[in-house]
Amino acid sequence: MHKLFEHQLEAVEIAKQSSNQRICLYYRTGSGKTLTSLLCMQAWNQDDVLVLAPPSTHNHWKKTAETLGITVDTISHAKFRMSHYKLSKTKALIVDEMHLLGGYKAAGWMKLNLLSRHLSAPIVLASATPNYNDADRVYCIEKILHPAKSKGYLSFLYENCKLEMNPFSQTPDVTGFLEYPDAAAYLADMRNVAYLPDNVEYEIDEVSYSFELEPAFHNYGLLSRTNRLAASQIEKEHARIIYSTIDRAGYLHKPLSDLVEQHINGPTLIFCNHSSIAEAAQRSLATKGYTTVLVTGKTTAAVKQRNLDAFRDGDVKALIGTASLATGTDGLDKVCDTLIILDDTQDDSLRRQLIGRILPRGEDSDASQKQIHRFNILS
């Protein structure tokens, strides 16, 4: 028997009252979207469901569904987008990590939109709150939930948004919403949306680390390890991060490695935006006697699951990874109180998802015991 939070019970009630059996779970990261989605399907008397979700979460979906007597078939977002993949018009559908289908011009969302017009079965859309931060994303949700209300994207903009004409585009620039402070508030107030605000309070400890690069790098963009000039500012910035963190042998520079070790406290999650830095961190910690597992975009679903299980079971000290850690990693909050953002991302939504991996669950979660260290690489 599952112990349910109030927001999960409210979502089920919204599902029951939905005239078209469609709902969006607009929850913060780590709020039990998997179980809640399936509970909505159970409320609609659905026992055979297609789940569109990241491959690393497929086993979790199936195990959770079993406890409710529901059979699920799982597919990835990539497979869903394939033109030859056909979908049933009579089978209930759960779309997890909805934002991974892209915006209104993306092939994934357009396929879902076309299916939803003819689907005679319930739909649950689910994704974490940080990912709904613009008009495009909100339109994509509204079009699926209320196809009769929402027309085209331009009509949506003119009816709901503050706009500025763009001389270089047929689509005007959105500067705000007419009746709401932002896109998030618009979605939270939408009919058939179950909303749980992202109001967990936590502190981020900023850790500064300095490394002196050669003057030729700053002056000319000389990449000394490949003996050529950086082709762009983007390449130069990537090189700056890599050169400042990784030595020529493929390990973290010793001062940085020592600084990372100082912030390890019990089972620790370590995020790196670059896979090369994640690999270097694993090598460096191994020399210090730490047991670790690595999860990157190259890690297969089976290996990722095995590594996550090893970390959850306490077999290893640190879980190191890239953006792959943002999805399919439920349950880390129960075993891990420390997150080290060694190599930060520019994506605020992704960072919030990663932080959410170690935050406790529930409506009024106390995150005072959680430690989040964000490294600032200066060079």
Provide a role label for each language-model segment.
Residues 92, 109-199:
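Conserved P-loop NTPase motor "coupling/switch" region that bridges the ATPase
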Residues 202-290:
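Conserved helicase/translocase motor-coupling segment
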Residues 286, 290-323:
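Conserved helicase ATPase core of P-loop NTP-dependent helicases/translocases
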Residues 20-39:
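Walker A/P-loop
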Residues 359-379:
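Conserved segment of the helicase C-terminal RecA-like domain
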Residues 347-365:
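Conserved SF2 helicase motif VI
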Residues 1-24:
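Conserved pre-motif I regulatory segment
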Residues 34-39, 44-65, 132-137, 273-275:
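Conserved Walker A/P-loop ATP-binding site and its immediately adjacent core
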